[in-house]
Amino acid sequence: QNAHPSPK
């Protein structure tokens, strides 16, 4: 799981 905003 990745609870971080995507750089796109």
Swiss-Prot record:
SS bond list: none
Principal location class: secreted
Compartment(s): Secreted
Top-rank taxon, per record: Eukaryota
Cellular component GO terms, alphabetical: extracellular region
GO BP annotations, alphabetical order: regulation of blood pressure
Tagged with keyword Acetylation: no
Pyrrolidone carboxylic acid PTM sites in chain numbering: 1
Keyword terms, alphabetized: Hypotensive agent, Metalloenzyme inhibitor, Metalloprotease inhibitor, Protease inhibitor, Pyrrolidone carboxylic acid, Secreted, Toxin
GO MF annotation, one: peptidase inhibitor activity
Free-text function comment from the UniProt entry: This peptide both inhibits the activity of the angiotensin-converting enzyme (ACE) and enhances the action of bradykinin by inhibiting the peptidases that inactivate it. It acts as an indirect hypotensive agent.
Protein name: Bradykinin-potentiating peptide 8a
